[in-house]
Every structure is written in C-alpha cells, then in structure tokens.
Amino acid sequence: MNNFKYILFDLDGTITDSGEGITKAVQYALKHFGINVEDINELKKFVGPPLRDSYMKFYNFDEEKATEGIKVFREYYEEKGMFENSLYDGIVDVLKALKKSGKELIVATSKPEVHAKKILEHFNVDKYFTIIAGADFEETRVKKGDVIKYALDNLRNTLNDNEVLNLSQVIMIGDREHDIIGAKENDIKAIGVLYGYGDVVELTQARALKIVSSPEELREILLP
C-alpha cells in the first residue's frame, strides 16, 4: 500500500488524543443547559464528529439550542480545552518517516481550522503538513466529506498546470466512521485506526480499506 502519495490525516483521535479537552468542554456546555454529566467518559462519543450533530443526536437539541451549545463549548475550549490534549505515542515518528519518504501530508478535520492550526503549532508538528484543512466558524464546511473535498481542492491548487490529481494516490486516515464515509464520498480510500475513539465494528461497517491498531502499524502499511 505504499503507492499512496497524498495522505490525509484526521486530527482528533488520530494525531492527538484530544478527549480530555473536548469532553470537559462538552460537560461545561451541557451544565449551561442544566444537564449534569459527572463522568466525562460518557462524553467520549463527542470526540471526532461535528459538534452540532452530536448535540442533536445524543441530547435531542434543535438547531437553535445546538448553536448555543457550540458557543458555550468554545468558551471553555478556547481558554483551556484546546491544550488539554497530547500527541499519540509514535505518531511523530510516523509523520517524520512519511515526510522523509516524499509523501505529501494533509490534515482534514471537522475541528475549526483555526483551532487545528493552533494545536498542530503547539505540538510543533505543523511543519509536516502541506495543507491544514478544517471546518469554518460559519459552519458551511463541517461535515467530513465537505472538509475532505476542501482539502482536495486545496491540494489541486498546489499542483502544476499540467498535473492532474490522481485520486487513486490519495488515502484518508481516521478513527471514526465519518472519516471513512467522508473519504468514500470523495472517491478516495481510507484506513481506520483503533487507537483513537472508534472501534472495529464501527470502522468495519463503514468499510475501511484496512484497520490498524497503532501508529507503528500504520507506518508499516504506508511505507515500503
């Protein structure tokens, strides 16, 4: 599988273990609505998918309430939660090796792009990525398929006039079903990772091309 030239990475649950900051921010936001969740582990299901979708799915928020929930979430997240976060063991070695081998690395995340850039800069791994593509605050680009399309459009803009992007050379790496489904919506393949917040059933049902258990295994697959 080392014929992939362009590798798109999800951020939360794939590059960084962002669970603590996200779940605490959700806990803070839910408390604003009078919903007390003592065990933040119950909120891990919020890591990865668009926040609006999760509010509506898990707490039956309507659009207006979900919008307010996003605003309150950001109050905590932008002050503290963004950096209640850590890199997965071994992921930097993978990024370094892929970059050295000539692969082009891209981030495609449902997290707001401005937050993604700050986090990657904080951990000094932004240097490995040609493009950092994320959601916008206006929510015109939040769903994973839309973010991946945006990332691919940005990638096409970096190519020479006589170059055409061959989608068979592009692959998405992510830990949740929406990463795999979003990739398929854009006619690219996807690898699921089990060290994040998804599980083997979710990734299998989404039809990931391959499922790996660690960054090291990811490296073995993507490099000769």
Residue ranges and their predicted role:
Residues 114-171, 177-185, 200:
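Substrate-recognition "cap/lid" segment bordering the active-site pocket of phosphatases
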Residues 29-30, 50-63, 119, 147-155:
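Helix-loop "lid/cap" segments that line or gate small-molecule binding pockets
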Residues 26, 94-120, 129:
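Substrate-recognition element of Asp-dependent hydrolases with the DxDx(T/V) motif
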Residues 56-93, 101:
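Metal-dependent phosphoesterase signature
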Residues 172-212:
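Acidic, Mg2+-coordinating phosphoryl-transfer loop and its flanking beta/alpha structural elements
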Residues 124-132, 202-222:
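Structural recognition of alpha->loop->beta junctions
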Residues 1-45, 59:
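Active-site neighborhood of HAD-like aspartate-dependent phosphohydrolases
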